[in-house]
Amino acid sequence: MSTKPSLSSADVSADAQPGATEKAEGTAVTAIANEDQIAEFSASPQRWWGLLVLAVGLGMIVLDGTIVGVSLPTIISELGLDIVGAQWITTIYSAVFAALLLTSGRAGDRFGRRTLFLVGLVIFTGGSVVAALSTSLAPLVIARVIQGIGGACILPSTLSSVNALFRDKDRATAFGIWGAVMSGAAAVGPLLGGVLTQFAGWEAIFWVNVPIAVVLFLLALRWVPNTAGETNGAGGFDVLGLLLSGIGFGAVVFGIIQGAKIGFAFPSAPVVTLLVGAVVLVAFVLWENRRRKNADPALLDVSMFSYATFSWGNTTAMLVAVGEFALVFVLPLYLVS
């Protein structure tokens, strides 16, 4: 199969839809590319530019999880916060991010991964602007929630797009680059946060996202085809699973953070919240297992945990993340004091 010398993702998406050219142009942003067009794009050198866009988008949201830590002492001082408020600023982003990953991944399969990527960029940019303009704790925490929602849209869309757009040996290379960016961005975050805070103020750690996201949005329309996954199953979208996972994870995070301030004596609010979160998460697992047995689309395939490599791999990743983010939060405050 021959390749076009200048094949854009808009061309791929438009050509994938039968009908008049003007109709294709009107739906180019959301049209889903078919297998032939994806294969043609995958053979084009332009696929590496698409990978660059996806990698930078991934790096931006991962970096935002660690860049705030170094700026916390300045934020605490200028906004008059206590340690619990500082915890909310860092933790709420990761909590929302994690709670929505399963849901957003399914949404990308159904509505298009580039579509989800673009939506995530818009949401993440909006959250960054709100964060940069914040003058108190409440709007800053709300902004971090918005950023978490955007980040949860971006990460799975980049991973699944890489899987769909690359073939054979190129796929292994692309996944290697994806993993390297994810690890490297987390390490660069504290360094970049320190530089920006020192020379431009803590607001700069959020303003820096805006021009990057705008450029990525435009380039994604040009270089990243819109792919989708299978959406088989008669059970529809797992709304209850979304609610259970969000409430469960949110309750656990709230209990842990507030427990540091109020204490964990029963029946204090943190303890009750932790118990509620645990019960809701158990209900989430049981519900997901029921949907799996009924062959309905599920947010989490709990049968995967029967594989030792999957279970131990996720356990290891969790322990590493706990240690990493604990240090990112505590170390800057300790060194400043």
Which ranges hold each PLM region?
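Cytosolic juxtamembrane N-terminal segment immediately preceding the first transmembrane helix
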Residues: 2-63, 77
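12-transmembrane solute porter fold
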Residues: 47-63, 68-70, 79, 89, ...
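Hydrophobic/aromatic residues within the transmembrane alpha-helices of Major Facilitator Superfamily
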Residues: 56-63, 92-95, 99, 126, ...
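Extracellular/periplasmic helix-loop-helix junction of adjacent transmembrane segments
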Residues: 71-100, 137-142
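Interfacial helix-cap and linker-helix signal at transmembrane-aqueous boundaries
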Residues: 75-76, 107-108, 192-200, 256, ...
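Helix-loop-helix hairpins in multi-pass membrane proteins, especially solute transporters
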Residues: 103-245, 267
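C-terminal membrane-cytosol helix-exit motif in multi-pass small-molecule transporters
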Residues: 171, 211-229, 246-258, 276-292
